[in-house]
């Protein structure tokens, strides 16, 4: 089998035991300022996105339907790929080294599973979802969006930086199809209350009932699949979950 350049680069930082990249080569601050003028390459419109470079096995009828916003080190993204092998999932991460880690992690997983074509349905891009989401997705394209353990921006002056706010909720509604779901999880109760307040006040969302939330097959995976979620479990912290439907 011929490996591509990204797979070859990933091998230089991988563990000899697991065959996966090691986080110690990708350390970075826990959060990044989403308002700062980072340097990003981004498409002018969704039609300009080269999805085939991210999903080598994509066919002409397929499109990305799941988006993990602020995907961190990719633990939950990998879980999505395993749970929904016929769906394309994208992770969007603003931090350079962290997004590099996820890209290398996916390359290593694809290489390890080259005989089964597993993990061909997940990918990660470095971008600022608070600014460029409509550049990547068409109207009503997405079925599910995930906001797991977002930066709480504790200071009141920085609340405007929170990834859930009234203006951005309208953008999310634009790229979400009717009936699509927004999954939110945090270990900060104040942020959870903020999210619930803003989303229930927005006319295009309704919160799922407790019964519907528990019945969703993704719900159990939200607690420990991501690295941040697993850390909260280890520290015996609280999880605050809310799922909303696009109406």
Swiss-Prot record:
SUPFAM superfamilies from the UniProt entry: S-adenosyl-L-methionine-dependent methyltransferases
This protein's UniProt keywords: Methyltransferase, Nucleus, RNA-binding, S-adenosyl-L-methionine, Transferase, tRNA processing, tRNA-binding
Pfam families given in the database record: Methyltransf_4 (PF02390)
UniProt main location, coarse: nucleus
Top class in the EC scheme: transferase
Active site residues per record: 151
EC numbers, comma separated: 2.1.1.33
Domain of life per record: Eukaryota
Keyword S-adenosyl-L-methionine: yes
Pathway: tRNA modification; N(7)-methylguanine-tRNA biosynthesis
An example Gene Ontology molecular-function term: tRNA (guanine(46)-N7)-methyltransferase activity
Chemical reaction(s) catalysed: guanosine(46) in tRNA + S-adenosyl-L-methionine = N(7)-methylguanosine(46) in tRNA + S-adenosyl-L-homocysteine
Localization per record: Nucleus
Residues reported to bind S-adenosyl-L-methionine: 70, 93-94, 128-129, 148, 226-228
Signal peptide (UniProt feature, chain positions): none
One GO cellular component term: tRNA methyltransferase complex
Job of this protein: Catalyzes the formation of N(7)-methylguanine at position 46 (m7G46) in tRNA.
Family that this chain belongs to: Belongs to the class I-like SAM-binding methyltransferase superfamily. TrmB family.
Name used for this protein in its record: tRNA (guanine-N(7)-)-methyltransferase
Provenance organism: Drosophila grimshawi
């Amino acid at each position: 089998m011929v490996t591509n350049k990204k797979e070859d680069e990933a091998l230089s930082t991988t563990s000899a035991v697991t065959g996966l990249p090691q986080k110690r080569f990708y350390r970075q601050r826990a959060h990044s300022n989403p308002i700062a003028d980072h340097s990003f390459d981004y498409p002018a419109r969704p039609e300009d996105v080269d999805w085939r470079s991210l999903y080598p096995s994509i066919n002409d009828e397929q499109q990305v339907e799941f988006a993990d916003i602020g995907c961190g080190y990719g633990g939950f993204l990998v879980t999505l790929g395993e749970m929904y092998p016929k769906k394309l999932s994208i992770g969007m991460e603003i931090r350079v080294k962290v997004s590099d880690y996820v890209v290398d992690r996916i390359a290593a997983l694809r290489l390890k599973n080259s005989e089964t074509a597993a993990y061909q349905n997940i990918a990660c891009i470095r971008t600022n979802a608070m600014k460029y989401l409509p550049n990547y997705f068409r109207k009503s394209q997405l079925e599910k969006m995930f906001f797991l353990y977002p930066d709480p921006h504790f200071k009141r002056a920085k609340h405007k930086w929170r990834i859930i706010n009234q203006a951005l909720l309208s953008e999310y509604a634009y790229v979400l199809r009717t009936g699509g779901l927004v999954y939110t999880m945090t270990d900060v109760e104040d942020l959870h209350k903020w999210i619930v307040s803003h989303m229930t006040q927005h006319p295009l969302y309704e919160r799922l009932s407790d019964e519907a939330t528990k019945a969703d097959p993704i719900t159990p995976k939200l607690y420990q699949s991501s690295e941040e979620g697993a850390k909260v479990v280890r520290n015996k912290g609280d999880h605050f979950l809310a799922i909303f439907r696009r109406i």
